Amino acid sequence: PRSPPRAYPRVGRPAPPPGAGAVRKPGPRAHRRIARVGGPAGLGHSAIRAEAFERTLEELGLDGGRHVDTGFSGEEGARATRSLLLTPDRPTAIVYDNDIMAVAGLGVAAEMGVSVPDDLSLLAWDDSQLCRLTHPTLSAMSHDVHRFGAEVTEVLFDVIAGEEVRPRPVATPSLVPRRSTAPPRAQGVRP
């Protein structure tokens, strides 16, 4: 028989991260077709984000949110974006699991003549410097990575010292709105 899994110290969020809710403001002109371009489904954080995305869509009463699981590269982000934008009921908003895929998605939208944010809102996940260097600048979820690193270091020192390690929650990411997000166009106005 297998022994029960060992509990390891962890630093993490007490609740799943926001996703679709970050690009959907309540109201009559809210996004209803939201997609997510995520990392490999087998990775724990990708699975947590996918679950949070699905739960948020359900809470918002939205059907048909689409996931495209890819690697984290720009090439795969571009391929996923292109496949989403070629569908007849293309999304009005896409949430990306990292900034590189979001930058690639922005490039694909430009190549395809899809105006960001007039026709499509894009949201990046990491809020790296890349988000401020694009045109339009990318809205993103901001994380306090320095505080997260400090918490991880404190946990490591506690483990090394043989001290009891308590769970350490970290702050939920916050939305940094920039120029890549806007309410969707009214029905029938989209080209």
List each model region and its residues.
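Bacterial carbohydrate/catabolite-sensing allosteric modules
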Residues: 1-191
